[in-house]
Design a protein with these regions (language model features):
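Structured, solvent-exposed acidic/aromatic patches
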Residues: 1-194, 206-214
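Active-site-proximal region of nucleotide-activated glycan assembly enzymes
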Residues: 201
């Protein structure tokens, strides 16, 4: 822990006045986010809350909207389509295969990777705990497809035939589910501002009481 925090303290000083050309490179807010993660893992909750808040404030980021979360073409695949991602990496179509790429593992809509066979989804008991007022629930297919007008880059038959509770969170870039070099050339989130809000809330709850965490 001490070694990691020492390195992060060095990064904090070196990146203090640095503005990267894109979010593919970390900035000071990302350093604070990493420090929040380390402190949270080490159960130093007060410090975790402090650095999560510093990450939020320094990032200038805002949580995803419902429209961004459920976007058929850009959902969780385009760093420039939202203001929530603090840091990400990008796949290049020149150095990826149909199997060795993030979307091929995570997107059930993709037709080129293992995900079309493994059908990633959510456990029923966890799904049932998510309120229908929480739009994040709609990235998983309810057994009763009429509860929400699910959208996909495929067609309605694909929605109807998909397994219950299948995930449609990670989308193919531009909605291209057939060409891995296009639909799989996505951005992958490394750090999002929502994570910092969750760390702050949990850390405050652990250090100052549940009410403080709920209010965060």
């Amino acid at each position: 822990i001490a070694f990691m925090l020492e390195d992060l303290a060095t990064a904090e000083s070196l990146l203090a006045n640095y503005t990267p050309e894109s979010k593919y490179l970390p900035n000071l807010a990302c350093v604070y986010g990493l420090m929040a993660r380390v402190y949270m893992w080490d159960e130093q909750y007060a410090n975790a809350a402090t650095y999560a808040r510093k990450a939020i404030d320094a990032s200038g980021c805002t949580p995803l909207t419902k429209e961004q979360w459920l976007d058929v073409n850009n959902g969780f695949n385009n760093i420039n389509s939202n203001n929530a991602w603090m840091w990400g990496i990008k796949y290049s179509p020149e150095n990826m295969g149909n199997l060795c790429n993030f979307t091929g593992w995570m997107s059930g809509e993709a037709d080129w990777g293992y995900s079309s066979l493994t059908l990633p989804g959510i456990d029923k008991s966890l799904y049932d705990q998510i309120a229908f007022s929480d739009f994040r629930k709609y990235t998983f297919l309810d057994p009763d497809r009429s509860v929400y007008p699910y959208e996909t880059c495929r067609d309605q038959k694909w929605i109807d035939d998909a397994v219950d509770y299948q995930a449609i969170k990670f989308r193919c870039l531009g909605g291209d589910w057939e060409d891995y070099a296009v639909g799989g050339a996505v951005d992958v989130p490394v750090m999002r501002v929502e994570e910092m809000y969750l760390i702050e809330a949990e850390a405050l709850g652990m250090s100052e009481g549940v009410d403080k965490g709920v209010a965060a």
